[in-house]
């Protein structure tokens, strides 16, 4: 029955009630509108059946638990009784043992009690100490909190009251206002009006005051208004650094002013100021070298770390065979001397070849390199440097590559300027000298005179106790040439010259040029190792694989050992004379090194140009305009280009400057012609010619093109062109002198001087000076010149004439009239 009731009874009873109402509202147009609103209330009624079932189930569980507890209690009681009986039987046996153990246990308990007491006291002390510290911390915190909260306590309480009970406070205040208003209602109207006005005003004032107080308290809570206090956490302060931070500055080989300033954390203007103090004018983007940057950084108190940027270059050049055995090598001999003292003739006699006759103007224009083998198998390599002063740089390079210098001095000419230069170069290179006194076959030859003149330049012969060998020779007849070769070999034995023969080759570029058919050609003197066909060569800014090698006779060779000069083909461009040539293992790395060198060269060149521009700007500001002669130089070999450019730059004066706008090796091209047109330059070709396209441009643009094969002519013509650009000079030449013998008055011309021409010729149109007691008192011109009644243009010496001086009537007897003309004086450099 109960199960049926459970099944039929609903779990919960829900009754829904609806309430409808009408709400009237006003629309935007001002009309009233009624809206029906229905409110539904939902009520739930629960039955008690489920609760009754739950109570019944709970009673059953409690009865079962009680029954189990009673059973357990009975079992425990039985067990305890059994143990008690057992203990009663064992008690007599145990009593003796217990009496002994009791005394021991009592001792232990006493000891334990003492330890426990000590431990308790220690804990008590620690606890008291901790409590004391905690109490102090609490008091300190409380003190800080009180100090902190003293300013904000009242405002925070008021603000919290304002937030929590603002409604009640407002109601109470409104009630107070109403009571104040009702106090004066029973009085007369006037008094009421007066008092009411006052009360009304007072109530308004008090209300406003209360509102403003509440607002001030609220603002003070959040740090606003005049009473508000800003929190310390919201304030931000910046302390200026007390001193400049000094740091390590890493400087590469070149660096711009802006980059240096950035690394030192200073303004670029500081660096510019510092460099101005050091005498350097720079701009913010100017590239400066490592040494200058180091000086500036150290001056500003920074530690400088210099960085070498060519690690790749060092790695490539360092990867070489260094353990190879050294062997004796042939000496490299440079022949130096003055122009036409017989250097090439002597060398050609040694080589048994007549090359000197073909030299233009008797000057060796290129460095020649030859090696000759002696009868006993020994070998000597000769370098022939040009003798002209313009080839100083070439001769200096020759001295660097050489072991022994043979100084050729003509016995009939003695020591000349280039002879002295050659001595200086030899000393600078540290190369020992052997003097060959040439042309001893001439009747005017004087060997003792040469020795005496060289003695003045610290070249002391063995005869005078020195170490320099003097060998008299005749290049024309061959006298003494064998003695000269023996002297060279003797000197080389003293020097003990050795070199690695089998390793990777290295050497120096003696000369280079661009061949129209073969491309870049470089003459290289191998200094160590063996240069082979197919080797990869790094040579200054250029690199390449050796495609072909030729000796000085034009014969193909496959390899060249130490002290052997060879012509090399296969480089990427024309290297500069004097560059080191090195064989490397990897062509790709050689290319990278060459490109790196080109980039660094451009940077350094740019830095130099910018510096020159600034220096020129400041010099031009002080000097004014300077005439410039623009020149484009093209020559057949690099050494000639360098020598000509240097000679032209040395021709510059304060009034006329030679500006080399372009230079290069090879023929004159269309590019050179267009550059000459743009820069208004003259083109100078030294042993080269213009091609067809260049000639067309030169003719069309009427460019000044000049060819030379002798450097003297080139320099003389450039000097003549520069002389034409000089500002002319003028001087006054006296051409006639007349003495005043009498003075006449003329109605038209005023005072007319009757004169006798004592010197030269008096001309009508020339300027004159009037001298009295040899002092110039007037300078002007003639108005009239007459002989008797005729106007004449000139009157010669010893003749009389009448002279009328324009705008001057104070002529007296005894005065002298000096006639002169202004003559232009031709200037030259």
UniProtKB/Swiss-Prot annotation:
Localization: Cytoplasm
Chain spans, region G4: 438-441
Region (G2): 362-366
Region (G3): 384-387
A UniProt-annotated Pfam family: IF2_N
Start and end residues of each stretch annotated as G1: 337-344
Composition bias, Basic and acidic residues: 1-11, 79-146, 196-222
Residue spans of biased composition, Low complexity class: 21-30
Region (Disordered): 1-44, 79-233
Residues involved in GTP binding: 337-344, 384-388, 438-441
Alphabetical GO biological process terms: translational initiation
Biased composition (Basic residues): 185-195
Comp. bias (Acidic residues): 147-160
Cross-referenced Gene3D superfamilies: P-loop containing nucleotide triphosphate hydrolases, Translation factors, Translation initiation factor IF- 2, domain 3
Alphabetized UniProt keyword annotations: Cytoplasm, GTP-binding, Initiation factor, Nucleotide-binding, Protein biosynthesis
Stated family: Belongs to the TRAFAC class translation factor GTPase superfamily. Classic translation factor GTPase family. IF-2 subfamily.
Known role: One of the essential components for the initiation of protein synthesis. Protects formylmethionyl-tRNA from spontaneous hydrolysis and promotes its binding to the 30S ribosomal subunits. Also involved in the hydrolysis of GTP during the formation of the 70S ribosomal complex.
PANTHER family: TR-TYPE G DOMAIN-CONTAINING PROTEIN, TRANSLATION INITIATION FACTOR IF-2-RELATED
Record-given protein name: Translation initiation factor IF-2
């Amino acid at each position: 029955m109960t199960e049926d009731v459970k099944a039929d009874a609903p779990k919960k009873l829900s009754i829904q009630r609806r309430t409808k109402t009408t709400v009237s509202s006003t629309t935007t147009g001002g009309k009233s509108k009624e809206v029906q609103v229905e409110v539904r209330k939902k009520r739930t009624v629960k039955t008690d059946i489920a609760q009754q079932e739950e109570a019944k189930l709970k009673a059953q569980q409690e009865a079962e638990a009680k029954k189990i507890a009673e059973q357990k209690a009975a079992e425990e009681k039985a067990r305890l009784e059994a143990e008690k009986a057992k203990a009663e039987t064992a008690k007599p046996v145990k009593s003796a043992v217990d009496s002994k153990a009791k005394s021991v246990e009592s001792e232990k308990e006493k000891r334990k009690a003492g330890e426990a007491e000590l431990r308790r006291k220690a804990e008590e002390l620690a606890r008291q100490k901790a409590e004391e510290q905690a109490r102090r911390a609490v008091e300190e915190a409380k003190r800080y909190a009180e100090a902190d909260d003293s300013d904000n306590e009242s405002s925070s309480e008021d603000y919290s009251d304002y937030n929590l009970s603002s409604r009640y406070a407002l109601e109470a205040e409104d009630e107070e206002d109403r009571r104040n208003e009702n106090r004066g209602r029973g009085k007369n109207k006037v008094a009421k009006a007066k008092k009411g006005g006052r009360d009304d005003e007072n109530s308004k004032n008090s209300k406003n005051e209360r509102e403003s107080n509440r607002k001030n308290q609220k603002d003070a809570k959040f740090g606003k208004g005049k009473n508000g206090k800003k929190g310390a956490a919201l304030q931000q302060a910046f302390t200026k650094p007390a001193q400049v931070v000094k740091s390590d500055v890493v400087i590469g080989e070149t660096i711009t002013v802006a980059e240096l300033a950035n690394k030192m954390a200073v303004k670029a203007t500081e660096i510019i100021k510092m460099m101005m103090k050091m005498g350097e004018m720079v701009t913010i983007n100017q590239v400066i070298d490592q040494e200058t940057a180091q000086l500036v950084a150290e001056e500003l108190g920074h530690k400088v770390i210099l960085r070498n940027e060519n690690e790749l270059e060092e790695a490539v050049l360092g990867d070489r065979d260094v353990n190879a055995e050294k062997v004796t090598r042939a000496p490299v001999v440079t022949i130096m001397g003055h122009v036409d003292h017989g250097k090439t003739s002597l060398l050609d006699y040694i080589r048994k070849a007549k090359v000197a006759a073909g030299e233009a103007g008797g000057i060796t224009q290129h460095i020649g390199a030859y090696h000759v083998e002696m009868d006993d198998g020994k070998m000597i390599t000769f370098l022939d440097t040009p003798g002209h002063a313009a080839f100083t740089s070439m001769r200096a390079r020759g001295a660097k590559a050489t072991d022994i210098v043979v100084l050729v001095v003509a016995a009939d000419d003695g020591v000349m300027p280039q002879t002295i230069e050659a001595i200086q170069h030899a000393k600078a290179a540290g190369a020992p000298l052997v003097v060959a006194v040439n042309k001893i076959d001439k009747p005017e030859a004087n060997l003792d005179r040469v020795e005496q003149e060289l003695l003045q330049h610290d070249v002391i012969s063995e005869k005078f106790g020195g170490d320099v060998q003097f060998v008299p020779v005749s290049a024309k007849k061959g006298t003494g040439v064998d003695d000269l070769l023996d002297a060279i070999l003797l000197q080389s034995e003293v020097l003990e010259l050795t070199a690695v023969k089998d390793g990777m080759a290295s050497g120096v570029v003696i000369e280079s040029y661009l061949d129209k058919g073969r491309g870049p050609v470089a003459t290289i003197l191998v200094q160590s190792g063996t240069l082979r066909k197919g080797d990869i060569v790094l040579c200054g800014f250029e690199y390449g694989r050796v495609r072909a090698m030729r000796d000085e006779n034009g014969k193909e060779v496959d390899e060249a050992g130490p002290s052997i000069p060879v012509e090399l083909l296969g480089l990427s461009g024309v290297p500069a004379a004097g560059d080191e040539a090195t064989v490397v293992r990897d062509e790709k790395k050689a290319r990278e090194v060459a490109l790196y060198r080109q980039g660094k060269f451009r940077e350094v060149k740019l830095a130099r140009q910018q510096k020159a521009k600034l220096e020129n700007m400041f010099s031009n500001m002080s000097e004014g305009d300077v005439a410039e002669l623009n020149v484009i130089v093209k020559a057949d070999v690099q050494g000639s280009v360098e020598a000509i450019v240097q000679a032209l730059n040395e021709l510059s004066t304060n009034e006329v400057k030679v500006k080399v706008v372009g230079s290069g090796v090879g023929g004159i091209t269309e590019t050179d012609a267009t550059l000459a047109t743009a820069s208004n330059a003259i083109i100078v070709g030294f042993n080269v010619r213009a091609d067809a396209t260049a000639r067309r441009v030169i003719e069309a643009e009427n460019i000044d093109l000049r060819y030379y094969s002798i450097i003297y002519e080139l320099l003389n013509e450039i000097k003549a062109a520069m002389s034409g650009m000089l500002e002319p000079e003028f001087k006054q030449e006296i051409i006639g002198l007349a003495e005043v013998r009498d003075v006449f008055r003329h109605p038209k011309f005023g005072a007319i001087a009757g004169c006798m021409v004592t010197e030269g010729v008096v001309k009508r149109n020339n300027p004159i000076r009037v001298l009295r007691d040899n002092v110039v008192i007037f300078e002007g011109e003639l108005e009239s010149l007459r002989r008797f009644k005729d106007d004449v243009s000139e009157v010669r010496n010893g003749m009389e004439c009448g002279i009328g001086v324009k705008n001057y009537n104070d002529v007296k007897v005894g005065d002298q009239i000096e006639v002169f003309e202004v003559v232009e004086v031709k200037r030259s450099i």
